Amino acid sequence: SDYTIAVKYAMFFFMATMIIEWVASKILKQKVYNLPDTISSISSGMTNNIKSILNLSVVIISYQWMYEHFAIFQISSSWWVYILAFFGIDFANYWTHRWNHEYNILWNRHIIHHSSEEYNLACALRQTISSVFQIYFFLYIPLALLGIPPKVITILLPLHLFAQFWYHTKLIRNMGFLEKLIVTPSHHRVHHAINDIYVDKNYASIFIFWDFMFGTFQKELPSEIPIYGVLKPARTWNPIYINFMHLLQLFKDALRAGKWKDKLRIWFMPTGWRPK
C-alpha cells in the first residue's frame, strides 16, 4: 500500500537523521543517546509500524463513512483544501494529545512516548501499540461536513505524523520568530519534561498557537533544565511492558478500591487520580 511505502522511506530518513544527531552530539560533547534506551525506542517504532501495516486497529466510524453521510458540500482536491485539512488535522491532534494526557484510561495510549528519560530523535519513534480502538473520529466531523475528500485526509495524516519527528532533539536551541508560529524543539522539550512548571504543557503538534489559544503554553526557561520521563518511571527497557504498564496499574488500583463507584470512576478521572 501507499502507506507501507511511505513508512519504509520515512524510517530510512529517520534512521539517517538519528545517526547525524549522534555524530553531532559527539562533536558538541553532549550526551544525547543511551544504547538500551535507543534500542527500546526503535523497537517501539517497529512494533507500531507493524501494527499499522497489518491494520490491527478497530475503526469505530471511518472518515469515509462520515464524508458519505455528513458532507454538506462537494469540493475537489485543490491546494487550499489541503491547507484547510492540514489545519483541521492539527486542531484535532491538539485535543487527542491533550486528552491522552489528562484522563487515566487514555494515558495508556501515550505513556510509551514519554517513558524515555532521554530526549532525542529516537524518542520520537516511541509510538504506542496499545491504542487498538480509534476513538477520536468525532473530531474529524467538521472536515467531513465541509466535504474534505477522504483522499486528502489519507495523504495528510502520515505527513502530519512524520512532521512531528524533527523537533525531538536537544541540539537545536531557540529558533527566533518561528517560536511564535510552529512547534520547535524548545517547545517540545517542555512538553516531555516532568518538572512541575512544565507538566501538562505544549500539546500542539505543528502550530504552537493552539497552546496560546487554549492556555497550555509554557516557554522553556534557562533556569529550569528539563528532566525527562514519566512521574512513575518504567524501570525497564521492555517496550511491550511499557505500553501496558499504566493499564495494569489501573486494574490493580481498581481492584483495591473499596467502593464500586471508585472502581469505575478511576478509569475516567484525571491522570493520577486515586480514591482516598
Features from the language model and the residues they span:
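Hydrophobic transmembrane alpha-helical segments in integral membrane proteins
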Residues: 1-14
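Membrane-helix interface/capping segments
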Residues: 29, 59-66, 99-106
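Membrane-embedded catalytic scaffold of the fatty acid hydroxylase/desaturase
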Residues: 45-55, 71, 76-228
